[in-house]
Swiss-Prot record, chains A, B:
InterPro entries: Kinase-pyrophosphorylase, PSRP. Belongs to the pyruvate, phosphate/water dikinase regulatory protein family. PSRP subfamily. HAMAP family: PSRP. Its EC number is 2.7.11.33, 2.7.4.28. ADP binds at G152, V153, S154, R155, S156, G157, K158, T159. It comes from Methylibium petroleiphilum (strain ATCC BAA-1232 / LMG 22953 / PM1). It holds the Pfam family Kinase-PPPase. Keywords: Kinase, Nucleotide-binding, Serine/threonine-protein kinase, Transferase. This is Putative phosphoenolpyruvate synthase regulatory protein.
Length: 272, 272
């Protein structure tokens, strides 16, 4: 599939079109070229995209694949007239739902009159601020309002996972490192003790941890395989002893880690 | 549409199913209850979900809507046997693509053998670390390797946008505040001058800024409407003078802001 182009054409940001399109394209081994055309909401703009699609088809000798999220019937019709394979996510699924619900759709694509004023959106921004302020044990204040506290050795994946939970799910995710001093003392950091129930552990294969730490501080004791082994094993024992559930981040993406954590903590305010 | 439940059933994290499902549900005014069932990858787990769907149908007197991203034919068939309306995103779109490409699909849903080892994933994690280290002008080091530097007054939306760009698009997004001292001096912070070309501005309506700042520091001069007006107007003049493109975050979601910035900066390494 070389010389093949995929277009994402949307009357909004195109995030939905692209996210969905990518999950479908991930089914195929080849990597086509991506072209994003957001905010296509007038016939004029649509005709411009059609010219681009047709030029591409001529140049590549293969018709492009075009993922669309377009509400306006006229705009949609114009794009359909191009020399391409159109995959229309809304048209295919919204109509059966109208029949099922017995109501007409709003003819909107993931857009709200003013998303920035919705409670859900405000909660997400607040969660991001909370997670930033509570990154890497920076603050023990307000841990009582955290939805989850990720714990684990340095560089086990806590920070990106916390931010992802906040950004995608509006979860107030603090994270707190387990460090050699804690292992020597044989006890959880005292700030965590009252909140043990909402702690969730991340662990990681010592070999992978060594690689990650080595990039940060080459040839340090901190990055040595021996030290990584000791820290990981001490952290796993401690989490086991304290009854803290954990998972390994070694072969998992942030999305997979986050989904597993959500399934486990099932915060009351999410129906999960 | 009260007492109506929507299920998201996936053999992976379910992020794709949910993102797509939500963009479709946003077409309707009512808010059904959401239930997420990720990692459904065996017949046993599928039968459990079927029981849940049927129980819900009985209790609510209406068949649930079920968005699925399931590759395994057996698992898919089991879910289809439940009393519900199934909306199958992969089945509907992957098959025509197989015909178009003339190759069989990988039968995978946005998953890779080991995503954590792909270059794309490593770049994303690196971008998150970069964006965190360069949040709020914390560091002027390595600004030359930033893909974009967001500028604007305090609380104009720079931090969440930077993190989103890093997390979703692997963009190294620094952010740097424009503060009263800069306006008094009438010049950009000196660290930004060599990198003006990759600066992108965020602005915000003074009334909205006042609300946001008021939550942080109630009744401060910082949060007063008069001060917000002065800062916003000074920042907009400065960006105009320096030839820095900007947009207003007032009525936009992070996703919309990020998409607009990407369209504008078109980083070379993304085919955008």
């Amino acid at each position: 599939m070389p010389n093949r182009t995929v277009f994402f054409v949307s009357d909004g940001t195109g995030i939905t079109a692209e996210t969905f399109g990518n999950s479908i394209l991930a089914q195929f081994s080849a990597k086509p070229r991506h072209v994003r055309r957001p905010f296509i909401d007038t016939p004029d703009k649509a005709y411009q995209v059609v010219r681009e699609i047709n030029d591409t088809a001529g140049r590549e000798g293969k018709r492009p694949i075009v993922f669309i999220t377009l509400i306006d019937t006229e705009v949609r019709g114009i794009i359909r007239s191009a020399h391409c394979l159109v995959l229309d996510m809304l048209g295919t699924f919204v109509e059966p739902l109208e029949a099922e619900f017995g109501i007409k759709s709003n003819h909107r694509v993931g857009r709200f009159d003013d998303i920035s004023k919705s409670q859900e959106y405000t909660d997400r921004i607040e969660a991001i601020n909370f997670s930033l302020a509570h990154d890497d044990g920076q603050s023990s204040k307000n841990l009582d309002i955290a939805d989850v506290i990720l714990v684990g050795v340095s560089r086990s994946g806590k920070t990106p996972t916390s931010l992802y939970l906040a950004m995608q799910h509006g979860i107030k995710a603090a994270n707190y490192p387990l460090i050699p001093e804690d292992f020597d003392r044989g006890a959880l950091p005292s700030a965590l003790v009252p909140h043990k129930k909402k702690c969730f552990g991340l662990t990681i294969a010592p070999e992978r941890l060594r690689e990650i730490r080595h990039e940060r501080r080459p040839n340090s004791k901190y990055a040595s395989l021996e030290n990584c082994r000791l820290e990981v094993s001490a952290a796993e024992s401690m989490m086991g002893r304290e009854g803290i559930a954990w998972l390994s981040s070694t072969h998992k993406s942030i999305e997979e880690i986050a989904t597993t954590i959500l399934r486990d903590i099932r915060p009351d305010r999410l129906i999960y």
